[in-house]
């Protein structure tokens, strides 16, 4: 519940544009997805708080459609379809269909021995994001792109921790916003000084540790 008012306050003071929002499962709420994607044009990268016990028929627990003939085969993500006056749709193609360019034209080559459709390109499934904005994410969960983006979040968290560590801000009991902001800035300055000292000492492997440099 705190995300939307917090971001509204942030954007009212900062004219920044962001492409992705990386959050943990605590932000897994329909209102957050709607706010980020529809109101702010930001792609949410948020894991499910818990996988549905009974996934929608034809989909797996991450909202990815499966092959009608073999539910172990996941359909392949093929981008987002955007048309004026219509909801954005996630395009999925047959897992045994290969997208290629021939003579400057996009074509699909189907290699399935038991196709579920007479179409030469195999089954194509367009899923409106608005049908379930929480499950039908613009970047499919557990895809390589989704996982790589989410890894960035853990790197940022470690960086934030190390920025707070020199002044013990991870255990701060301050309630005053201005005082806390001042301590965070001082901590960032301290961390930068550590980096400069470590670099001058040719000891860059310890740039995040004042204790190790002192030793």
What are these regions (language model features)?
Residues 1-14:
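Active-site beta-loop-alpha junctions of metal-dependent nucleic acid enzymes
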Residues 93-138:
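Long, low-complexity, polar/charged, intrinsically disordered or flexibly structured peripheral segments
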């Amino acid at each position: 519940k705190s995300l939307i008012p917090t971001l509204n306050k942030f954007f009212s003071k900062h004219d920044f544009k962001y492409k992705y929002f990386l959050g943990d499962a605590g932000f897994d709420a329909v209102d957050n997805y709607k706010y980020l994607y529809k109101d702010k044009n930001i792609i949410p990268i948020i894991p499910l708080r818990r996988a549905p016990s009974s996934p929608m028929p034809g989909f797996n627990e991450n909202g990815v459609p499966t092959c009608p003939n073999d539910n172990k085969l996941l359909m392949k993500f093929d981008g987002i379809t955007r048309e004026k006056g219509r909801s954005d749709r996630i395009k999925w193609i047959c897992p045994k269909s290969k997208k290629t360019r021939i003579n400057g034209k996009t074509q699909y080559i189907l290699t399935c021995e038991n196709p579920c459709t007479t179409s030469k390109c195999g089954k194509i499934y367009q899923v409106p994001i608005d049908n379930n904005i929480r499950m039908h994410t613009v970047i499919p969960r557990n895809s390589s792109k989704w996982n790589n983006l989410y890894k960035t979040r853990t790197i940022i968290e470690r960086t934030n921790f190390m920025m707070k560590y020199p002044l013990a801000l991870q255990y701060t009991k301050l309630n005053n916003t201005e005082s806390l902001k001042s301590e965070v800035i001082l901590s960032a300055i301290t961390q930068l000084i550590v980096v400069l000292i470590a670099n001058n000492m040719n000891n860059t492997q310890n740039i995040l540790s004042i204790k190790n440099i002192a030793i």
